[in-house]
Amino acid sequence: MTVPAVLDSAGRRRSPATLPGYHAGRPPRNKGMRYPADPPTVEEIVAVRRHAADDRHGWRVRAMIIVLWRAGLRVQEALALAEHDLGPRRGSILVRNGKGGRRREVGMDEWGWEQLRPWLDARVQLPVGPLFCIIDGPTRGRPWSGAAVRSEFRRLAVRAGVRRRFAPHQLRHAHAVELAREGVPLNIIQRQLGHANLGTTSIYLQGIDPEEIITAVHARRAPMMSASAGLRL
């Protein structure tokens, strides 16, 4: 039996995952599953963003990639954002209800804010609602779903030729790894990600390539000793 195509108001094919109530009440298929820390590279993330359309749908998914990658949000935290939670002048995003009901403020770089602009400009033309909302049809302005985000990420990753898993949480891992590479202290990374303990943050950093560790340690200088120590090296 052929399932009829689902079209949006412009006649374009629409993923069933974007329909209101899709998989309502069902747990995600990957609930409870653990994936290795294998974050995408900068080149892979940029390639996926470039394959998003140059319209409101594309600007929305590009903006979602940005807040997950450059601010390290969980996908549900991003989907719960309102426009007034954004503080571009301070470079901050307010997460009102993070994991465990915890509230926190996170930072985002200037480049990330610039990348949000096309979607922010388009969003004001839609009904009042969450920052990331449905664009077409009778539910315009209603919340976008996590299932729809994951579906869109998979589709764009295939088009971009990215072979590794490209999912919202992988972008969060990429954020943590990049901060560590840039020398940001572990306790600040922990606060940025909203982790209750450093052990969880350390797991995220397992995505650092062993070759990077070897190179960094191999490049260390010889130990420095004061003359008064009386020790020969």
Walk through the language-model features, giving the residues of each.
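Conserved catalytic core of the tyrosine transesterase superfamily
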Residues: 1-233
